Amino acid sequence: MMASQDTKEDVQHSAQKTILVCDDETDLLLMFRIYLESQYKVITVDSGESCIDTILDYKSKNEEIDLLLLDYKLGDISGDIVARKVKEIDDLKILMITAFELDNQIVNELIQQGLIVDVVKKPVQLEQLSQKIKETIAGQ
C-alpha cells in the first residue's frame, strides 16, 4: 500500500512545473521559495549571470523551466538585458518583477517583442502573483 502512495507522489512531483526566480534581494528569494514550493519546483538565483547559467544548464540536460520570475533591477545587469539573453537561449515565459515605476512604453515594447509576458509590481501581493503565474504557465 505504501509503494502505491510513493508512486503517486513521484508522478505528482514529476508533473510539477519549474519556476526560476531571479532577484538580488535574498529575503525576497526566500519568500518566493516558501510561498511557491508547495505548488512548483522552485529554483532561486541572485544575479543575471546565475540566471542565464541556470537556464543553460537546464537546457543542456533537456530539462525544462516553465517560468522565469525576473527582477528588473539586478545588481549585475538590468532585467530587460537578461530577458533578451534568455530569449536567445530558450523561449521561456518571463514575468518581470519591479519596485520601480516602469514607463508604459518600455513595458509595451518588452511585451510586443515577446521578451516578457507581463510586469508584477513590488511589493508583491502573493495571491495576485500566484494567479498571474497560473495564467502565464497555462498560456493565457
What role is predicted for each listed range?
Residues S47, S78-I81:
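Acidic catalytic/metal-coordinating carboxylates
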Residues D71:
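Active-site residues of response regulator receiver
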